[in-house]
Amino acid sequence: MDFAFTEEQQMIRDTAAAFLKASSSSAAVRTAMVSDKGFDSGLWQSICADMYWQALHIPEQYGGMGLGYVELVAVLEQMGRYLLCAPYMSSVAMATNALLVAGTDAQKTLYLPQIIEGKIASLAFNSANRNWDACAVSVTYRRDGNDFILNGNYRYVLDGDNADVMVFAAREEGSVDENGISLFVCPTDLNGIERAALPTMDQTRRQATITVTNLRLDESTVMGDVGKAAKHLNKILDLATIALAAEQAGGMQEVLDMSVEYSKSRSQFGRTIAGFQAIKHKAADMMLRGEVARSAVYYAACIADEALNDGPLANELSEAASIAKSHCSEAY
């Protein structure tokens, strides 16, 4: 485990910072927030075609760059810093991870290149209880020959109203807790899928409700073993937690930089407030908490690489994700 960026990782981070500083200004974010889709389609295509960020941690055999989660987190940190309005979290940190963790080779071959090209994908698992684990799954399925019939409602689906591809989590009728949970991947133009935008407090992040009514899916859509996907779903959610924590770490750095800059320009009692000891203490506390949180994120990213490659530290993923989540949420 390395405790400093490689030259390549530093270049990726610096390039992301420069690109997003130029393309995701405050004015651009406000414009994207009130647009129909909630993001700038031109910017999204530029991220796909020019920056190739959707492909960062996708293996080369599926058209990706074959890099790791540390590189992904380095980019996500800058996205959080500049409040990028784009379906990146849903497509890359959720749907792509779902395919990498639980997808068959055929599913990866079909859908990962589409995500790299700019198709929007997402994960739907939650209902009204808002829990962040496999027990939150309430949509049910039943077998009908070789097919599966899904019924129920999903809430808080990230970019669900814009998604071209969905990963659905559902539980077998009559099952409880983490038993009987399966994952399915399919396009969103099938009969039986209804979507509606969900008003959110955070307008930089679009969410939706999705209702599935007698949605018929065949065996080719099943990810992993039928009824045994709870462990996969929990792993996917841990990976998404680390990604969100990375965005928070970037946001923290921007808040600190803005605060320090303001303290240098605001004058009181004949001098700038940056010279006041109380302000210095506050800035130092902010920096310390931010560095601790960032360290937790990058440690978790290293563990995520282990988990995605079945390394010796893979079983520490949930703990590392929780530590990053706790530190970043408290500090931010």
How does the language model describe each region?
Residues 133-151:
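Cytochrome P450 C-terminal beta-domain/meander region
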Residues 66-75, 133-137, 186-187, 216-217:
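Structural signature of FAD isoalloxazine-binding scaffolds in flavoprotein oxidoreductases
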Residues 136-139, 156, 187-222:
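Flexible, small-/acidic-enriched active-site or ligand-binding loops
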Residues 84-106:
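N-terminal glycine-rich flavin-associated loop
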Residues 151-196:
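A short core secondary-structure module
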Residues 117-127, 168:
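A short, Trp-centered hydrophobic/proline-enriched beta-strand micro-motif
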Residues 101-103, 142, 168-172, 185-187, ...:
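Short beta-strand-to-turn element immediately C-terminal to the catalytic PLP-Schiff-base lysine
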Residues 1-83, 102-107, 114-118, 143-148, ...:
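Alpha-helical interface subdomain recognition
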